[in-house]
Structures are given as C-alpha cells and as structure tokens.
C-alpha cells in the first residue's frame, strides 16, 4: 500500500505533537520541588552588572566571619595616668616579688583633670557630668588617710662599718618593688610599677631619715627602717608579709641584720607577735564600727 504525501504529513504532525507533549511532561516533572520566584518588572530596566549578576545567580557562598578591627583612631582616649599604667605593663626583665592580687575588682579613680574635653554638641551632658563630679569632690577630699594607731617597724642594720652603699641599696629595693616617692623615702605599692595604695615604706634610719637620689652614688647609711602603719593597707597581713620578704632580701644580699623596733634581734617569734598585733587591731576596728 503506497503512502501519499497527505499520510506523511499526518505522521510527521503526530510525531511533532508527541514530542511537544513529551517535552512539556518532562519539564513539569523536572520542575517539581523547586522554589518559584516572581520577578519584579521594575528591575528590568536596570543596567547589567557582571559583578552583581555573579553575586545573584551564582551558588551560595559561605562568608567568613571576622571580628571588627580597630585602629588607633577607633580607640577611646585614655588619661595620662592610664597611659603610664600601660607603659608600666611593658616592664623590662627586672627581678620582682610579684604584685599583690588584693582586689581584682578594684579600679583606680580617674583624675578629672585628665579627662578629655567634651564635644560642643554634648554640652548638656557634660554639664551634668561636671555637676556630679562636683558633688563627689567633697567625698574624695574626705577620704584622707586615717590617723595611725600603731606602726610595725623592721630595721635592717649593716654589719659592715661602711654601711649600705647607695647604688647597691637602690638596686636591691627596686627589685623588691619599692619606688621613690613622697617625703623623699621609698614606698611599696600594690603594683610593682608603683600604682595602687601604699603597703609599707622604707626610710633612712639615720637622720634626717631621707634619701638623695641625685647623690645616690656617694650615699651610704648604716641602717634603714621598714615600717607599716595601722590602720593602713586594706590587707595588712599580706602587706606585712611582703615587707618581711623585702627586709630579709636586703639583709641577705647586702650583709645586714634584722632588728625589731626595740633594736633587738628579729626572731620568728617577734614576727608572729607582729602578726598578732595586726589581728588584734583588725578586731578592735570591727568592734568600733559596730
């Protein structure tokens, strides 16, 4: 049976229709489970940008999270006292006994004169702060050291007739954390850098009782006196232990002899007696507060 042109056209049409139906069925099946996005026609007129299209059409990327970095301009201004403390943190390799961790929560009070000038738009807030500082000023002035009831003294007397030489004495006490300060004598603060409250002090046991750093090379003394006042540091027992360690170090390294306040030999029993005096003083102070 011969197939005419008409029959061939019918067969070809059926094949085309079947192909279209099959392709549509394949597309519908392949589109299942995919999210459909409705394009906004308002973006149709935007200029093409290869960089942006790559961001939009490309695969999802995991962006690494980075902590914000700060340069020196981002950092808040600090007072001169804080700057000195930070410089003090970069101490050179000097032998030390270590700082007392007496109160981790304690922060040094900022000096109002060191504060930065406020910006002009914030005059209202700055006035409020100044008023608060003025209100606090009397309380700060009132927080003066209380009168001393007792003084614990440890004398270190040189065994050599030439006494303690200035340079060696200075090196020794600096290693123990004492720093030259008020009244031209040395003081041991909470921090080895000379910050914080005074724990104890060291004076020249020979009149006039002071030290001359300008002439320290020619200086010598037969004895020095370590002393701790009560009431004084917030933790007097720990401060006393540091004072005993500094006195023993000086006596051991510079050939000295430890004496008590009566110039008698300082024994272990005498040291325990000093500690008991501290305990008794603390007990009396608590009783008075009640």
UniProtKB/Swiss-Prot annotation:
Q: Name one GO cellular component term.
A: plasma membrane
Annotated keywords = Cell cycle, Cell division, Cell inner membrane, Cell membrane, Membrane, Transmembrane, Transmembrane helix
Q: Name one GO biological process term.
A: FtsZ-dependent cytokinesis
| Record SUPFAM superfamilies | Cell-division protein ZipA, C-terminal domain
Q: Where is the composition biased (Acidic residues)?
A: 100-114
Q: How does it assemble?
A: Interacts with FtsZ via their C-terminal domains.
Segments on the Cytoplasmic face: 23-290
Where in the cell does this protein reside? Answer: Cell inner membrane
What protein name is recorded for this chain? Cell division protein ZipA
Taxonomically, which superkingdom? Bacteria
Q: Which Pfam families match?
A: ZipA_C
| Protein's job | Essential cell division protein that stabilizes the FtsZ protofilaments by cross-linking them and that serves as a cytoplasmic membrane anchor for the Z ring. Also required for the recruitment to the septal ring of downstream cell division proteins.
